[in-house]
């Protein structure tokens, strides 16, 4: 490995590489979420017949993982670089390995392993065949071929590549703590994120108002359902994301029992499934505009029979 890229140079390198592979460069979605997969740029676009190739950075919040900034590798909020390609290219793994080379990691000089780890997200009714990618013994990426999203079978199959940017940067820069990562020349990761990490951890574990969160969950759930009754998919999905984050805050606070936890997840999943079905129906009414004309004509003709 030659030059040690800064955090932002890693992002810029990945953006340029995946742009060259035909991916649109999207921006982070402006709602709290636990993973890049939950962005509508993945969750909604992975279903239905239309092609979709996109890449974006997604800050991901996981309240239960907060450690007050005292753990060098476990965070309330981390950053993922998300790539989704639909239909999945037959050479997606080769494309991924080539992206590592762009970051200065020669696959021939390192121990890179694809370790089977099938993926599931119960709260969104999503699952797929998956692998963790290990670089010299450290997981840096999750690879998934979606089989189901929002309770719907995916066709064509979407490939998802999720880079853990903090882990990748720690490896490239050879640092033991994420807070020592160089974000930009002369600016460390900790100088930007250590204080927010401490404050969000304190809030999540000690300060959050449980009664307010419980009330908010109910309100967000009702508002999602109300939006869906009017066929408003995207506002509804925003409220599904709010339900998910609110539940994660309640879970971190220890405010839900094991039995209640299952119930909350089921409620979020039920909403997500309705969102998914409504989205596909909405795209069909529009004539699946991202499809080429020949494929669109065949699909719409089949549905008319």
From Swiss-Prot:
Keywords attached to this entry: Aminoacyl-tRNA synthetase, ATP-binding, Cytoplasm, Ligase, Nucleotide-binding, Protein biosynthesis
Subcellular location as annotated: Cytoplasm
Top enzyme category: ligase
Keyword set includes rRNA-binding: no
GO biological-process terms attached to the record: glycyl-tRNA aminoacylation
Pfam family, one: tRNA-synt_2e
Domain of life: Bacteria
EC number(s) stated in the UniProt entry for this protein: 6.1.1.14
Family according to the record: Belongs to the class-II aminoacyl-tRNA synthetase family.
HAMAP family reported in the protein's UniProt record: Gly_tRNA_synth_alpha (MF_00254)
Descriptive protein name: Glycine--tRNA ligase alpha subunit
Native source organism of the sequence: Streptococcus pyogenes serotype M18 (strain MGAS8232)
Highest classification ranks of the organism: Bacteria, Bacillati, Bacillota, Bacilli, Lactobacillales
């Amino acid at each position: 490995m030659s030059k040690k890229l800064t955090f932002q140079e890693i992002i810029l390198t990945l953006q340029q590489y995946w742009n060259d592979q035909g991916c649109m460069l999207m921006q982070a979605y402006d709602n709290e979420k636990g993973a890049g997969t939950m962005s509508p740029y993945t969750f909604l676009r992975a279903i239905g017949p239309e092609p979709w190739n996109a890449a974006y950075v997604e800050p991901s919040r996981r309240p239960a993982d907060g450690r007050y900034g005292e753990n060098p590798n476990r965070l309330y909020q981390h950053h993922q670089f998300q790539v989704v390609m639909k239909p999945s290219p037959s050479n997606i793994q080769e494309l991924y390995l080539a992206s590592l080379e762009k970051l200065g990691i020669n696959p021939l000089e390192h121990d890179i392993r694809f370790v089977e780890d099938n993926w599931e997200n119960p709260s969104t009714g999503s699952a797929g065949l998956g692998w963790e990618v290990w670089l010299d013994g450290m997981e840096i990426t999750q690879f998934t071929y979606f089989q189901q999203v929002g309770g719907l079978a995916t066709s064509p199959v979407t490939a998802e590549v999720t880079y853990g940017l903090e882990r990748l940067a720690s490896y490239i820069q050879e640092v033991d703590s994420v807070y020592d990562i160089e974000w930009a020349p002369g600016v460390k990761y900790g100088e930007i994120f250590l204080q927010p990490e401490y404050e969000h951890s304190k809030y999540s574990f000690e300060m959050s108002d449980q009664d307010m969160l419980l009330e908010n969950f109910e309100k967000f759930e009702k508002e999602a359902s109300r939006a869906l009754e009017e066929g408003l998919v995207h506002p509804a999905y925003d409220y599904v994301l709010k339900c998910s984050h609110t539940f994660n805050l309640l879970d971190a606070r220890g405010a839900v029992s094991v039995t209640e936890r299952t119930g909350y997840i089921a409620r979020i999943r039920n909403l997500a499934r309705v969102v998914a079905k409504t989205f596909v129906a909405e795209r069909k009414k529009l004539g699946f505009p991202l499809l080429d004309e020949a494929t669109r004509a065949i699909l719409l003709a089949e549905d008319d029979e």
